[in-house]
Amino acid sequence: MKAVLISSIFLFCLLPGVSAQHRTIGTIPLGGTQPGTTQSPADKMAAIPAYKQALSVFDKLVEARGDFRLPVPKFVMLKGKGNGNAAFMNYLLNEVQLEENAFNACKEYGDAGLAFLIGHELTHYYEKHGWRSGFVQEYGDLPIGLRLNKLTDKVANETEADYLGGFLAYSAGYGLFDKGPELIQKVYTAYGWGTESENYPSLSDRQALLLRTKEKLERLIEVFEMANLLTAIGSYAEAYEYYRYVAIRYQSREIYNNLGVAKVLEAMNEFEANELVYRYPVELDLSFSAGSKGSGAGSLRDVLLRQALLQFDAAISMDPGYAPAYLNKACAYALLGDSTRARFYADKEARNAALDNNQYPKTAVDADVLIGILEAKSGNTEQAKKLFQAATTKDSKLAAINLSILNNDPLPPAPKEKVGLKPETIDGLKMAAISHPIDNDLFPKYDEAKTIELTDNLGFNQNPAPGPNSKVYISNNSLNTTEPLTIFHFTTAGNKGKTAKNIGLGDGRDAIVTAYGEAPRTIETPIGQIMVYKQIIFILKDNKLERWVNYTRR
């Protein structure tokens, strides 16, 4: 049995401002001023609470984007109405500009409203929307320049900035912001902008686009969540396709990292049990059946591991300080048998990146766990024991398990199924009622409007509200002829229910272990742990239950 470590991320808005003549919160100025206009020092606000609050949101969004291939823009706040743009990406100065009036317009929405505005502008920058507007300005007299300066192009840029900016704000921890139409109305009102313009989408069109974009964003988040759940239960090849679907639409270090993790874990299924004595600290970044081996298993696993290395390199290219990718790269090299490179990436790259500003303290501990495995495999038992013991004092459950393996201590037995045990339910629904809602039904109930076809053979379905505080995700893999359906029924915020063994949200890890025994599979995160049992998953934050998931395959 292999254990995996998972870290936690997540994914994800604005709109353009408008004057009667010019409209944008994007790549085109919204007032009478042109991009690059220099403000006097008095017009730029700093060292005041509003600026500090907005700067904190900006910094979190930049960190969540994790793309440092381009210089990070400077964030400035302009006094009052500034240049009349509300929020603006100034490419000449490489500044994201937020005006005081725009800040005040989104006050009631807190940091989530600011993330909506600022995330929109950062998306213009990272998606290089400025190239088009710059081309139009320089070659506007040519036919191609005139064609590019079309309303449809502006709509496309603004819609993409809403969509990917929303994903960015979500990934930075600000949730799915659903007040965009209200906020844009307040911005228009604050600036006295008209609702119609020849050169920009109308206010009503803008609001309609926001609602549609929110729906698309929800689908993308749901696909990402499904990928994480599939990874947790070991459906790695299937999870890879879900991650790939997201990566085509949104690129980030976490997505590339998770693509690589899926390949590493799939490769681990190609090892014999005696080849994987220890548990490797592979880290899946969340925001969440090995069969018989043929003669080509060794070459297949090497191919998978080398594919994983390419994905980790892509994540590192976006953010050279992203410690989890270095650690996962080290794990891949260790599994390839290259202990020299594995030790270098764990001891030097992963550890140094993790300890820089103490951004990834858990990853630093996990690096020690991997080095301990390398020492043990090299016969340096005492050094391995010291590393595992030190990591155990830092509350590493994985280190404790590896220490037991090193000492030949018996591991806790897997929980036994108890005859007559009350079935697990969420919102009063048994998994049987979810997977077979009507006797002899071939497919669970789902919302057709939310169906996504990821490939010709893989579909994602869901029932968004089987009960008041739960959701259902269904993966339909037609290539799997024995168990094509994987069904997850999970709690959502506010669920007051209990499991069959009286465990509820907020209960501690010890209570779960007392009720269910030690999990046969655990997945570490920087803020907690995922405990995977035969038909139930517990997701912990700070050793407290944040949500649980019932699941089945059929």
Protein language model regions, located:
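Positively charged n-region of N-terminal signal peptides that target proteins for export
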Residues: M1-L5
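Bacterial N-terminal signal peptides
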Residues: S7-L14
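Residues that line or immediately flank small-molecule/substrate-binding pockets and catalytic motifs
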Residues: S8, H129-G130, T552
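A generic structural signal for short, solvent-exposed coil/turn residues
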Residues: F12, D67-R69, F88-N90, A247, ...
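Short, structurally constrained coil/turn elements
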Residues: L14, R69, L442-K445
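Sec/Tat signal peptide C-region and signal peptidase I cleavage site
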Residues: P16-A20
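A Zn2+-metalloprotease active-site environment signal
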Residues: Q21-P415
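Short helix/turn-capping signatures at newly exposed starts of structured segments
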Residues: P413-R554
